[in-house]
Amino acid sequence: MLRSISFKIYEMRRYLILTLVVSMIAIPVADYLVIQRDRNRNEMYGEAFWIYGFSVYEMTDSEVAEAMGPPFNDGTHILPPYLGNITYEYPVFGLIFFAIATWLYPGVGGLQPLWLNFILVLVFNLNLILIAILLRDKLYTERWARLFFAGYFIYGLIMSAGGGKLEPITDCLLLMALVLNKEGQNGKAMVALGLSIQTKIYSVVALPILFLSSPISIIWFLLSTMLTVIPFMVGGARFDSLIQHFLNTSDYSTYIVNPMYPGLAFDTTNLIASEPASYIWPPALIPLAIYVGFMLFTFDRYLPEKEEFRAASWWDRILLLKPLYLYMVPAVLFLFRWVMPWYLFWFGGLIFLFKKNEHAIGYLKEITIIGFVYTLGILANWPYFYHGPLPDFVANFPLGIFSLVPLMLMIGVCIIVFGLWRWTINKQEEHTMKIREFEERGELVI
């Protein structure tokens, strides 16, 4: 894998320099435009780890901020009040990553938050290299591959330079696992996947596929997940907030911020009433209805041929159903109360596990449809979102509507970068086609 990464870095060196320049510009711009609570919070917990160890998992945000003092008690290093003043909900590897990152940078405050963005930007650019390795020639020949690459570029730039979130690290370890799996290094792939899950747990959806590739390699996965057991054994840590998140309890969040969540149709909280109350709102089912209709028309493309399925052994039948499993994974986004817009790309990396181009294209369309129904869900339940989740989300942009000006400039820069990259790719394709034409005519190409 290291050899592949080195070769791909050399091959894409010009584009990497360009993306790094764009990322460096985006870091201070985003820091000025957005209150990056996740980054600030991770910084606070990273510093607190060296004082309190794994017992930080037993402390709420407010308790940690009060114990750490300035600048962590300024209100921007904790999550909003509607999240119930929760404890740290991320698995162990993410905590250790930020603990090391804060240890490498002397002092607190000042440029330390930008330092965290910088590290995440480097990880994001490594992710672009890993994606290029997984796509191989498809990056130059398939339109869906270029669209996915462009989409991940914008997503990764926002998560690293504009959000300071854990997603780039999680994706990096997941992509490493997929590269190692393609190289036949199944044990190492499982170790990387285990670390990815312990950064943010959403990458667990890739575990069944990697397990089917080599069932015996699950041993390495279990060994790598021992990292999570250590806090339990040594510090008595608990992951109550993570469990509450998965159980969809109101203890995690008093708001339902997922506009696709079917529960809004039967129990939408009345945020205007002076006393706690709820009401029925049938339009909240519109996103689910559209998604179900889309899936009913498309899921049969991911089913194996009937004759092939009948003739296969029980194990081969399971393998034949892998595309269907991958296609159904994004449906879990409808099950949780807390789903933010960028969660749509959480399962983007699964696209590399499809062997057929038509399956990958269909999967990309599914993610697009989910993004559409997410937006439609906000409009369908506008009275609820207008009086609660949306104002709280917009509050993270201190400049208000004026934040759109530099934001549009950054989007414009991203479009220009993609245009330059696409232009060079087209020139390479034209050059390659001309060489083939000359060779077919029997001409000598020097």
Residue ranges: model-predicted function:
Residues 355-446:
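Aromatic-enriched
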Residues 191-212, 332-343:
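Transmembrane helices and adjacent periplasmic/lumenal helix-loop junctions
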Residues 2-179, 183, 188, 214-328, ...:
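Primarily membrane-embedded glycan-assembly and transfer machineries that use lipid-linked glycans
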Residues 162-167, 334-346, 382-391:
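Membrane-interface catalytic loops of GT-C/OST-like multi-pass glycosylation enzymes that act
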Residues 129-134, 172-183, 209-217, 333-336, ...:
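Transmembrane alpha-helices and membrane-interface helical segments
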Residues 118, 195, 227, 330-331, ...:
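Hydrophobic residues within the alpha-helical transmembrane core of Major Facilitator Superfamily
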